[in-house]
Design a protein with these regions (language model features):
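N-terminal Rossmann-like NAD(P) cofactor-binding subdomain of oxidoreductases
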Residues: 1-203
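Single conserved hydrophobic/aromatic residue that forms the stacking wall/gate
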Residues: 205-217
Length: 217
């Protein structure tokens, strides 16, 4: 029997990509999806490339929780905590693609994301979801914080060289640049092509996560 997976925030960039990945997953099936902006609309009306999912309609969050074994949240930072509590209380697994559960320290979370922990005990249940390093810790857990892009690509690229003794762990520099899909679909001047083309913008928020998770020792 396949795992029933629901997606909250399925019409954002991350959510839409998750739809694509889960439709091809041999052990999972999408049970329900939700979208605040497109509730009641077909996903294929939002993304014509998903015409093969013509009968998949965006519902509300409660429907996703009710119909699913595991709920993925592809929401902006700060919007996953209440939903996570609801899912855990209902005995469902919850995987957050945002940053709400990535940092163990509330002080650091407030510093970088401007929010607070709504339930500290809930945060204590969260496990960092990078299976290449933490597979044993993730097994059986109900609340998983999906790692961000920098904390995924950098350690996974470096680890084979370190494990095989090809490089020293001292003096490693990760020179990273990212695109703007992580900023979401909502248009704004900062994400407008003429503002971004051939330019770089310093984003210190990405420092918080890699420096708080010792992935390689």
């Amino acid at each position: 029997m396949k795992i029933k997976a629901g997606i909250v925030g399925a019409t954002g960039y991350a959510g839409a990509e998750l739809v694509r990945l889960l439709t091809a997953h041999p052990e999972a099936e999408i049970s329900a999806i939700s979208s605040v902006s497109f509730e009641g609309d077909k996903l294929s009306d939002v993304y014509p490339s998903y015409t093969f999912l013509n009968d998949m309609v965006c519902e509300n969050q409660d429907a996703v929780v009710e119909k699913s074994d595991v709920i993925f949240a592809a929401l902006p930072h700060g919007l996953s905590q209440e939903l996570a509590a609801k899912c855990i209380d209902a005995g469902k697994a919850f995987i957050d693609l945002g940053a709400d559960f990535r940092l163990e320290s509330e002080e650091e979370y407030t510093e970088w994301y401007g929010g607070t922990f709504l339930d500290k005990k809930l945060h204590e249940q969260a496990v960092y979801g990078l299976p290449e390093f933490f597979r044993d810790k993730i097994k059986g857990k109900k609340l998983v914080a999906n790692p961000g892009c920098y904390t995924t690509c950098s350690p996974l690229a470096i680890a084979p060289a370190i494990v095989n003794g090809l490089v020293s762990t001292k003096g490693i520099i990760c020179d990273c640049k990212s695109g703007v899909t992580g900023a979401g679909r909502k248009p704004n001047q900062g994400n407008h092509y003429p503002e971004l083309n051939e330019g770089f913008h310093l984003s210190l928020i990405h420092i918080s996560e890699p420096t708080r998770h010792s992935l390689i020792s």
